[in-house]
Amino acid sequence: MTFSPQRPEFETGKQPDPETEHAGDFFEETSSSAPRAASNGSSGPNYTLITTFLAALTAGIFAFWAGWTRKWISDDGLIVLRTVRNLLAGNGPVFNAGERVEANTSTLWQYCIYLVALVTDYRLEDIALWLALLFTTAASIIGVLGTAHLHRKRIAVLLPAGVIGYFSLSPARDFATSGLEWGLSLMWISIQWLLLVLWATSGKTSGKKASGAKTSNPIVNAGAITYALAFWSGLSWLVRPELAMYGGLTGVLLLLTAPRWRVVLGILVAALPLPAAYQIFRMGYYGLMVPHTAVAKSASDAVWGTGWEYVEDFTGPYNLWLGLALLLAAGALTVWKTDKHLAIPKGRLGLRTPGMAIALLVICALVHFLYVIRVGGDFMHGRMLLLPLFAILLPVSVIPVNVVDRGWQDLVALVLVFSTWVWSTVVFVQGHQWENTGQHVVDERDFWIDFTNRDEDHPPLYAEDFLTVDSMNDYAEVMRDQTLVNPTGQQLNILASSDPTTYSWITTPRVEGVEAGDLANLSPTVFHVNLGMTSMNAPLNVRVTDLIGLATPLAARQPRIEGGRIGHDKLMDLEWQVAESATPLAYTPGWLDTQKTYEARQALRHPELVHLFQTYREPMSYHRFVDNIKYALTTGRTLEISDNPEDLLKEFNPTPAEIQDGLETIAWPGEIKLDEPRGEPLYSSQ
């Protein structure tokens, strides 16, 4: 994407409007020793345009190939697809039909899959894989075009650098697919970067001559790009919550540089309605201000030490600091070649410059890095650091090397780029050597290949590929022959044999009579630590819950385990889960504490828990919607319950657990719609 730098002057005698005047910036004006492509009288090839196209093509091909060779789907990716199944069936954007729980972090990602599923018969796993891969590919191309636009006035060869370094990293290739929203997030960041660059180069600049103003990029309408950037910034919150920082700071910059109140109003109108409308919907429908995953993975505590260990786990295997040093040094040389005599931007209106666009993106990325470190990182190798890394590498996604009037900086930049390519090649070939030793941070792709008892060349791609996990032994058979045939309270995972280690599944009957009460409205329930593989291998009329709290509010509200695995540091006891199901107390599994199970069932009627159940189970109505908004703004932000039911029983007058009739309702009857089986796989991993 290149634009001819036409420079129409104002009419004679007219001075530029001080409210729209901006000073030039170092990427707008190149040094006198580096002639502008547009002002060169040569009829030779446009090296900048040609190499922009080649760099974008190279980046796209490399990103696609890198992601394709590591294609797979994670258990967390399957969680998203369960919500999509409920959307397709007509049960709403929920994980379990009848329970309004937002189990996915990215709002837009689930709807992207849903929209494609509406018009195709492809399996959801295939749709998720292809969308993620195409979004990732688009992100690499758009990122290159955005950076190349900064150098459009040079006569230079643009060499792909940062984008090559990024996709040489094993986790970057792993999360190019995986079923998660990383491809969508990368594309959002890239488009945000491109729009920032176009915005920064489309205002009016004051040149060295005082006679008039000139338009730095007349092909892009300055007003339209401002509102487009505002709208795109508003979407940040719906892509991933932490991207709201990028969108929010961009919005602040747009407001600061707005020349008139009418523009300020236009920016607000473009940016706020969609995210604000969804936020009202989220609070009224789910009873929360944030996705439910944010409640389960509470980030309220600062664990800097653990976070830095997470950084070292990511940087160490790839000598990432070396790669970053090479890329940032090449970027610094690009800045070094700028004309030191350019006017310094003055006033708030002078902030509309490419330099400010770069500074904004870098600041956002650095703050993002700090946030990840503060919350302790993640349990997946490199995952949470990929987005800020991609963002900070965008300004150096390509490095310009001047074709004419080359200086020593060009030679050094060329050496640095080639060194980056060598480093990237070594890192790409070497990969990430990981062994499952039970550590807190795991290579998620290799973990699931190992956990599903598959080999490296056949990673899991579909829900049924996870049935080879040891703990999923006979899961589908018990589901088909018992859970869906007989009145069932729960389907439970058991250790059938310790030598050799063998797992199996059993079922419990359903409550009846006075012990049932409204618990009889609960569907047959599967309880397991991994939500994706259990839920995607079960029909929608089977309720699937977890002990971490991703889809289980009762678990999400329990206290964190000190020193636990980041992101998985809440583990609800099985006694709570049996109590909060349609399982008769007499059939409490023998390995559980029967007294604790009894007390947990009593504690379900604690006023705070009753209110919690109402927010996501009571049928939707105007009253429920309004009450949920109030709850989201108050109790929903802070509620934490003890994992010991005895503590809760001290706070109210409990009734005997054997009698559930006539109590405050915590489960409501409702119709559950089933989805239709989808088409054959596009390819086979077998």
UniProtKB/Swiss-Prot annotation:
Entry's EC annotation: 2.4.2.-
Membrane topology of this protein: Multi-pass membrane protein
Domain of life where this protein originates: Bacteria
A single Gene Ontology CC term: membrane
UniProt signal peptide: none
Main localization of the protein described in the UniProt heading: membrane
Skewed-composition ranges (Basic and acidic residues): 8-25
Designated name of the protein: Terminal beta-(1->2)-arabinofuranosyltransferase
Organism: Corynebacterium glutamicum (strain ATCC 13032 / DSM 20300 / JCM 1318 / BCRC 11384 / CCUG 27702 / LMG 3730 / NBRC 12168 / NCIMB 10025 / NRRL B-2784 / 534)
Gene this protein is translated from: aftB
